[in-house]
């Protein structure tokens, strides 16, 4: 494998050993992220990689073993089956993945965004007292369409963000939030909304042959 020399001046050290937890419904994306991280960190050349501050920097995988088993009553619990003490923990969740199912009283139920969010809270609570920093990566922001109140309505998105930070989450990363001003609910914590317009256009041009972008062919 080709080695790439890191020529930047490294003036900071990692917050902690990197750990990635991909919840059910986000496993495939988590595996792709893990593959990229392993490849990128293996190819990097830096004199600091073997120092104590960089312990655990280069590993064969950064994915941590976790699961959310359910009792016969339908209730669940979050379990992290590896140590996360001092880790820089990233939790990935796709709240809009409706393909995941579970059995309750003999009936098969599909997981709703509420179910995925509850699983996120379970895993967050399992690692909040041990991990040095917790970052949630949520491609679709949970309840982002309910970001403001127009009458006697619940502010679900703001409540969800406040719940997460109260449980120990330090940063939340999402993509194209419906209204980025919802971060006002947690002004003292990290909230990043990435605009994916460039990736959408690049994906269309790459997979849709003959696509012409001009005033005659586009709205």
What are these regions (language model features)?
Residues 1-219:
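PRPP-associated nucleotide enzymes
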